[in-house]
């Protein structure tokens, strides 16, 4: 319970940052729209529509159906993060060591060191077995990773992590922070100012990628806001840099409460081979 309370403080901290700079963030987003779409556009109206698209986008958690442990999932009745599992399925045992370092900087955890719940959110480093040294550390203090799938990708919002996915209920988005890039990648650059919350989606629009080739987040949002048809590029949701909007869930993800739909890819199913 105390770990989850620390996670809520992280969410509140990021939201406070966005609230503090909300006027600056909105002006930055408006300038970008004006610069890239033309001054003759009603930039404020377009921005409001883009925010609405993001707030109404579906939230997905991708997984590989051939690798996920459904028995364990049903046993716990909730989706667990890599700290609770000990590592990310299919990844190196030291995965959480790097993840902890990135999260500590990206979410400014050191600024919450005076919190009474801080001991439950600090790993204290890792043992040779790659387990947190701190006995008070709680895996619930750290987020569950998802994607904001505003383009309704055939395989969810981050198919590089598996072509199957859970679609979560809309209310879960209120418990999230969002990044225009994977926080592990160099594009994010451990820059906390790029993070947003449900109430401050303008920050995503101000910072999202605008690549010339492949999936283009900014131009896709502009087209959707204008009511134009958007073709989903094949590299949407792939890679670990800028091809999807990353979400960080600071709440439990209960199977029978928070998951709206389950999509299983036949490419990952054992039935497709029989």
Model-assigned labels for residue ranges:
Residues 77-78:
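Short glycine-centered helix-capping/turn motifs at secondary-structure transition points
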Residues 145-148:
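Short hydrophobic beta-strand that contains or immediately precedes a catalytic carboxylate
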